[in-house]
């Protein structure tokens, strides 16, 4: 991945909620904290040569690195806070703080580390970044992309409601089912599906709780989805947004990411539905790129992803929703793009998988079973077949991140 200087990465999933709260002392929910803990070494696989990753569990991380074949081992350092504070700025030069997603709390953590002596440059938080992270920005981008692609069938732009009454008005005048979303959420979180035009008591309580916390919720028709995909980009912060790759991924019914396909970019594009195998794909990529240049290009610097989907229309024909979600952060799709480029053999097809196990010990047993079932085989310095873990798996782990190539 392109960078202008060496970086210090930090994996902080679920940062959207932290952006919404806007407090430097924000504490993520338990699931986000556990995911950040178990998958803290994931930046190894998208960081540039010479970068570093700020981690907590150095012993397990060192053992994990030692377990990788030398030809596959990233030229990236895994450093705990004390080791970072011992680095010399004169020798090392400053490292640019680069979290998975920018938010006030993670930047405050980097700043505390800098004050302890770590030679790092910490970006300044801007309220403009909060505005861009709000789902209203994605809604505005959707409108602009639709204007640039008049050949697409119209899709409903999300409506933002500030009261239960406004939600009721929407559902009683439109056709069910519906998707309700909180303004700072992603990957299936903060989403409620309304299957009918009448709102149940539990659904009303969910809406009331979301409104108390966030002030608004968005609502839109739920589409008959047949495929998920995303386009990944990089913004230089000076008005230039460039295409970084295609992600074809899978989700739980509620929308949470479960896995992304890996392989040669042309072969991945060939896995898209027929509607995207012609000129529409390139027109879509151009329209979204131009929209992002206008919207985020001079405010945000870094990688980002735009989630999209293919859906079935009432007449049975396929159509594209060109802008479901804007992710101003590194994404699992970007991780998949880099794994396809760096790790997976060009003749192989695989999947990046994120799995959550119910209890400590389950993840380690699953990892051991997968390693026996799919032993790794390498060719030309790349993974040709097998199951490769991307993070250490310990008896305490709940989350796993791994590649399967079969």
Can you annotate each of these PLM segments?
Residues 171-193, 215-225, 325:
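ATP-grasp fold ATP-binding core
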Residues 214, 243, 255-318, 356-383:
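A long amphipathic alpha-helix within ATP-dependent nucleotide-binding catalytic cores
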Residues 2-52:
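N-terminal-proximal low-complexity accessory segments that begin disordered
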Residues 32-42, 54-169:
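Conserved N-proximal alpha/beta basic substrate-recognition cap immediately N-terminal to
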Residues 345-406:
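Peripheral (often C-terminal) accessory segments that flank ATP-dependent C-N-forming ligase machineries
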């Amino acid at each position: 991945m392109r960078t202008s200087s060496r970086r210090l990465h930090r994996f902080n999933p679920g940062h959207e909620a932290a952006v919404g709260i806007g407090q430097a002392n924000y504490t993520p929910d338990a699931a986000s904290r556990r995911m950040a803990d178990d998958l803290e070494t994931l930046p190894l696989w998208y960081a540039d040569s010479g970068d570093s990753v700020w981690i907590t569990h150095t012993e397990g991380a060192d053992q994990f690195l030692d377990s990788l074949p030398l030809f596959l081992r990233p030229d990236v350092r895994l450093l705990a806070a004390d080791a970072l504070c011992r680095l010399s700025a004169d020798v090392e030069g400053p490292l640019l703080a680069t979290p998975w997603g920018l938010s006030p709390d993670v930047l405050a953590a980097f700043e505390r580390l800098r004050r302890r002596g770590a030679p790092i440059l910490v970006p300044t938080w801007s309220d403009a970044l909060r505005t861009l992270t709000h789902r209203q920005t994605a809604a505005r981008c959707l409108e602009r992309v639709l204007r640039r692609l008049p050949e697409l069938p119209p899709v409903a732009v999300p409506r933002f409601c500030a009261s239960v009454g406004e939600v009721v008005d929407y559902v009683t005048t439109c056709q069910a089912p519906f998707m309700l979303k909180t303004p700072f959420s992603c990957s299936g979180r903060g989403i409620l599906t309304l299957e009918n035009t009448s709102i149940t008591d539990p659904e009303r309580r969910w809406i009331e709780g979301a409104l108390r916390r966030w002030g608004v919720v968005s609502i839109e028709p739920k589409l008959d989805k047949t495929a998920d995909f995303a386009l990944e980009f990089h913004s230089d912060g000076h008005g230039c947004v460039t295409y970084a790759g295609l992600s074809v991924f899978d989700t739980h019914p509620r929308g949470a990411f479960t896995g992304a396909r890996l392989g040669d970019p042309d072969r991945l594009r060939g896995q898209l539905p027929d509607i995207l195998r012609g000129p529409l794909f390139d027109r879509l990529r151009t329209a979204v790129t131009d929209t992002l240049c206008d919207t985020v290009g001079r405010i945000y610097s870094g990688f980002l992803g735009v989630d999209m989907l293919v859906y079935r229309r009432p007449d049975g024909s396929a159509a594209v929703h060109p802008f479901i979600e804007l992710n101003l952060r590194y994404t699992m799709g970007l991780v998949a793009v880099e794994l396809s480029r760096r790790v997976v053999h060009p003749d192989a097809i695989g999947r990046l998988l994120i799995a959550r196990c119910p209890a400590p010990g389950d993840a380690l047993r699953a990892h051991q079973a997968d390693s026996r079932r799919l032993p790794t085989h390498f060719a030309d310095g790349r993974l040709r077949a097998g199951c490769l873990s991307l993070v250490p798996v310990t008896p305490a782990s709940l989350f796993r991140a791994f590649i399967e190539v079969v």
